[in-house]
């Protein structure tokens, strides 16, 4: 897993956000075109958190996404979101890696609004950080229900309904 004290690449653009219940750092190491701003990431993270946390959200390009997915999951391609949990105590400590090109391609292919898709995957990562998973069917139902509840409360459409 990446270490919290070492950036994965040189010179990321960091946007630290300090508040008592959430310390959020957003690292933009991919092209920032069409990537939501720190204010939106903060809103989405806070909506999904159930306890204090220190979170780094890192937006990466396809190459870094492929390297991380290969090194930590044994997969040969980039994925949309990876979550690295460092501590399940309070505050939670973890990193969420979002692969910008994968997210953009998925949104286009699925007919989803790009911002809504970023919101969904950020919420998905935060739920993983809190111990939720979707390996077993019954766990997937719980996690997807929570994702849907949170994202619709924020005014976005249900991410599991196919958009036409």
Swiss-Prot record:
One Gene Ontology term, aspect cellular component: cytoplasm
MF (Gene Ontology): metalloendopeptidase activity; RNA endonuclease activity; zinc ion binding
Secreted among keywords: no
InterPro entries xrefs: MetalPrtase_cat_dom_sf_prd, YbeY, YbeY_CS
Keywords from the UniProt entry: Cytoplasm, Endonuclease, Hydrolase, Metal-binding, Nuclease, Ribosome biogenesis, rRNA processing, Zinc
GO annotation, biological process: rRNA processing
EC assignment: 3.1.-.-
Subcellular location: Cytoplasm
Enzyme class: hydrolase
Cofactor: record remark: Binds 1 zinc ion.
Entry superkingdom: Bacteria
Position of the signal peptide: none
Pfam entry (one): YbeY
Binding residue positions for Zn(2+): 124, 128, 134
Similarity comment text for this entry: Belongs to the endoribonuclease YbeY family.
Classification via HAMAP family: Endoribonucl_YbeY
The protein's role, per its UniProt record: Single strand-specific metallo-endoribonuclease involved in late-stage 70S ribosome quality control and in maturation of the 3' terminus of the 16S rRNA.
Name recorded for this polypeptide: Endoribonuclease YbeY
Organism: Nitrosomonas europaea (strain ATCC 19718 / CIP 103999 / KCTC 2705 / NBRC 14298)
